[in-house]
A protein has these predicted regions:
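Generic detector of low-complexity/intrinsically disordered segments
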Residues: 10-14, 40, 110-113, 117
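N-terminal export/targeting and maturation segments
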Residues: 15-77
Length: 144
């Protein structure tokens, strides 16, 4: 019985879902220089329609991978819809709700005041956004 309780606890903590907006915004604000370096510096060479994952270590992407570690992210890539740069936070959960960061020169919609709960009217695989800084957004996607 004791083992069943432990397994249930581990299963539930693994399905806790993404971080809150407040935690994500705080991380962004505390590490803003590293987030900016990811998208504006010469260290990250991101191919369109491809994600650079932190475990893909080569000499040419070492500096970019160090920046990803500093912002607690697992990957970076170009979002094909907004053409912005998407930063994928490290997540150790199995939730159907995904959150991330996106840097976009274009204004992104739909905007929501909070992404802590599933936004009303947002369809599966459609992204919702919360603006946290000039050209920076938190993204939310429900992956049915």
């Amino acid at each position: 019985m004791r083992y069943a309780a432990t397994i249930l606890f581990v299963a539930l903590t693994g399905c806790s879902g993404p971080q809150t907006d407040a935690k994500m915004q705080s991380l962004y604000e505390n590490k803003k220089e590293y987030f900016s370096a990811l998208v504006t510096g010469a260290d990250c060479h991101i191919e369109k329609n491809k994600i650079l994952w932190r475990h893909e270590v080569t000499k040419s992407n070492t500096a970019c991978l160090e920046l990803l570690a500093k912002v607690e992210a697992d990957g970076i890539g170009v979002d094909p819809i907004s053409e912005g740069i998407m930063v994928f936070p490290s997540s150790r959960n199995y939730s159907s709700h995904r959150k991330g960061y996106i840097f976009s020169a274009k204004a992104l919609t739909p905007l929501y005041p909070s992404l802590d709960e599933h936004p009303a009217g947002l369809q599966p695989y459609q992204m919702g956004f919360k603006k946290i800084d000039e050209k920076w957004y938190i993204t939310y996607e429900y992956a049915n």
